[in-house]
Amino acid sequence: CHSLRYDRLYSRRNTCLYLLLTWMLTALATVPNFLVGSLKYDPRVFSCTFTQTASSSYTVCVVLIHFLVPLGVVSFCYLRIWTLVIRVKGRVRPNPKVRAADLRNFLTMFVVFVLFAVCWAPLNFIGLAVAINPAKVAPNIPEWLFVTSYF
């Protein structure tokens, strides 16, 4: 369908640039942690980790930018794909081989998305709860809940 565009977008050179950009953005995303002072050793998880009580506004921003916005964008995209599939279902000639492979790929990507949401939701929702009232909420979160949400 778009093979010429694909070859141009994902050439060896562009793929290397995408990887470099990904690593640069990842490194850039850690810089605010050092400015806010939100990285501290947490003996509950035996690791240097993001301290949700360091700054409420920063915690909310992290949850929004790193969890809720990606979750919303991907949910919107899946909803659009699903509505398009339902809308054109009757107009497309059935091809069992292509249809099965496409459905399997779609479901695999959807499962990865659901696993992302399920794995990261507890830690992010705990972060939002702590950001609302750090002094009251943080001490009341059971240690087992924090540790299991971290891993």
Curated annotation (Swiss-Prot):
Transmembrane segments: 14-34, 59-79, 110-130, 144-151
Example GO molecular function: melatonin receptor activity
Biological role: High affinity receptor for melatonin. The activity of this receptor is mediated by pertussis toxin sensitive G proteins that inhibits adenylate cyclase activity.
Domain of life: Eukaryota
Alphabetical UniProt keywords: Cell membrane, G-protein coupled receptor, Membrane, Receptor, Transducer, Transmembrane, Transmembrane helix
Extracellular domain ranges by topology: 35-58, 131-143
The encoding gene: mtnr1c
Keyword Membrane recorded: yes
Cytoplasmic topological domain: 1-13, 80-109
Keyword Iron-sulfur: no
Main location: membrane
Name of the protein described by the UniProt record: Melatonin receptor type 1C
